[in-house]
Amino acid sequence: EHIVDHLIKIRELQKKTNGFVTLIPLKFSLDNTELEQDNLVTNECSSVYDLRITALSRLMLANTLNNISVYWVAYGKKLAQVALSNGGSDLVGTAFSEEIYRAAGKPTTSSVDELATMVKEIGRKPAQRNTHFGILKQF
C-alpha cells in the first residue's frame, strides 16, 4: 500500500512540474548494513516483489513518466533483463562512483558492450543515451 501511495504522489507531482526524467526503483540491499548486523532485518524482498514494483511503476506512471529505469547493479544482470521485459525502459548503473551496492559487496562494473549484449539478448535494440534520454549511439 505504501508503494502505491508513493507512486500516486510521484505521478501527481510529475503532472504539476514535469520535473522527473525517470524513476529508478531501488532494491534495498541488506548486506553490511546495521539492520543486518543488529538482526532487525534478516532478508531482502524477493525478486518477484522487485519485478512487481517495476511493473506497477510502469502501469501507474503511464502517460506521465515514460522512463522506468532498471538499476542492474542492484538487480544483477539476469534479473535486470527480466525487469526490462516487465516494465523497465532502460538500464542504468554505469556510474563510476557507485558506493551503495559496492559497500554491500555487490558487483558494480560492466562495460557498455556487455550492457548492450544484455539488451540484445532480450530482443531489444540497445542505445547509449544522455541524462535527458537523447540517443548518443545505437549498437
Where are these regions (language model features)?
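Helix-rich catalytic cores of soluble enzyme domains
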Residues: 1-15
